[in-house]
């Protein structure tokens, strides 16, 4: 199953036909520019560089920079991963003593420019990202159809804030399934799926199929390609300890948490799709949890419940763009909705056979407290136009954690 088939279960909010087309035919068709938090420029212990990369995975280029600078990749800070098949600009921090070495580094399709001294950049140290995206292979009527879709979505309050396909895997759409197995304590089945699932189109698939059939760890270590380093880490640790649980805990923390995050994202997408079918997204109901919004940026840690008493007040705040209705990123400490929205949340959990306690019973590094996430996206500064012999060009800003591909999905209707 590829991501298109996977996403067919999630409803579109727009009912108008999409424009079709293709993205990322060229890396230059998808440009991402990070807007950092101003606080990263406070201090003198780290050197801040602007990293421009083309067709590079974020972690891969970070490790290459670290290798050439003679430092650990853990000493390089960055606010978030960016698309690989794109041209992206983001800020990274390195120890101040490594500034000159980093300035001298030359890597193909990578540029590094010293900006300032500051502090270590952590994940989440950004306001959001600016995008310039071209959709190719569209008809001349694409502009008018885009205009109709955007008008419809503005009337409905925005674009649905689905987690994009990057969260689940583009071809091996199994991250969320692995996450569910981990929540259920099925570490052996989670390992079998992570190591053995093959879609038939990727290097290493034959080795994966062999493991699926035999579960022979020694053979897998011989056959798995070196670039499947996390799979090999899992295999090595299992061989050493005889425990798939310990094997998962040996993975780097960001990789270890990908699976639980993917399952949380899947549950959120299920909730959002059901809400599109059954309940309003831009009209708060009694029992809803809303998040505060300032300058178009949602503050997900600032929430309050809708009650009979404050219902009209909250509705006005939502209309003015000062608050947004939220959905659940399930976790052991997440603030639950009540009323009809709360019943829908409970139905999602019951349908999956999962309780919130399961998120707490995970091994400590994997345990997830959960939080709220706004149901709608309102791209800031959205402009678009048709370029003859090229396609549709879009420019907009999105807050952190929001996916440009989810905006494009409503316009293209390609998945």
Swiss-Prot record:
A Gene Ontology molecular function term of the record: tRNA pseudouridine(13) synthase activity
Reactions accelerated catalytically: uridine(13) in tRNA = pseudouridine(13) in tRNA
Domain named TRUD: residues: 158-378
Gene3D superfamilies named among the record's database cross-references: 1.10.1510.30, 3.30.70.3160, TruD, catalytic domain (3.30.2350.20)
Superkingdom: Archaea
Pfam family of the protein (one): TruD
EC number: 5.4.99.27
Keyword Lipid metabolism: no
First-level EC class: isomerase
Function, as annotated: Could be responsible for synthesis of pseudouridine from uracil-13 in transfer RNAs.
NCBIfam families reported in the protein's UniProt record: tRNA_TruD_broad
Protein name: Probable tRNA pseudouridine synthase D
Organism: Thermococcus gammatolerans (strain DSM 15229 / JCM 11827 / EJ3)
Taxonomic lineage from the root: Archaea, Methanobacteriati, Methanobacteriota, Thermococci, Thermococcales
